[in-house]
Amino acid sequence: MKSGNGPLRVGIGGPVGSGKTALTEKLCKAMSGDYSVAVVTNDIYTKEDAEALVRMQALPSERIVGVETGGCPHTAIREDATINLQAIAGLNAQFPDLDVVFIESGGDNLAATFSPDLADITIYVISVCQGEEIPRKGGPGITRSDLLVINKKDLAPYVGADLTVMDSDATRMRNAMPFVFTDMKRGDGVDRIVGFLKEQGGL
């Protein structure tokens, strides 16, 4: 499923604090040995996520580009993705062998979606800490993303979340589309996500 005009583009969305940057870091580290990888991060007024990925040594700094979206980060991934497409074009020019670009959205809500012009595959990240009812609340990120990641499963006992309930709700809301429980802090579940990207993205 690699884009006709270059690398596979993977959109990573989800609410603030769900673990998007941690997932992006783990995927970069897991895949950069076998593939040419780059990242575009979206922040409203800063380049904080891009700088965090550089500090984490997810990739060499020249492979990480931060864009500032201004007031509404949803627009930059949906209605007018120009700023992101320009960043990807710049990375493509610098790294002609690029295989995968991860596009991390700014912290957003359950209604946020990626334009099909921007992302070939979409991953939506939610956190157990946001409440066990999150999967059944629905929204495009929950119901229509190609892969739903339910992160911070290790914290379920501390926040009163029942993973069995979340599993049942996610199964019902997603109509057999895949989802995975993860603990990004420990890297638990990363292999399954990499496998999904390889299979669905034709890598």
Curated annotation (Swiss-Prot):
GTP binds at G14, P15, V16, G17, S18, G19, K20, T21. The gene is ureG. It is found in: Cytoplasm. Keywords: Chaperone, Cytoplasm, GTP-binding, Nickel insertion, Nucleotide-binding. This is Urease accessory protein UreG. Homodimer. UreD, UreF and UreG form a complex that acts as a GTP-hydrolysis-dependent molecular chaperone, activating the urease apoprotein by helping to assemble the nickel containing metallocenter of UreC. The UreE protein probably delivers the nickel. InterPro entries: CobW/HypB/UreG_nucleotide-bd, P-loop_NTPase, UreG. Disulfide bonds: none annotated. Belongs to the SIMIBI class G3E GTPase family. UreG subfamily. It comes from Agrobacterium fabrum (strain C58 / ATCC 33970).
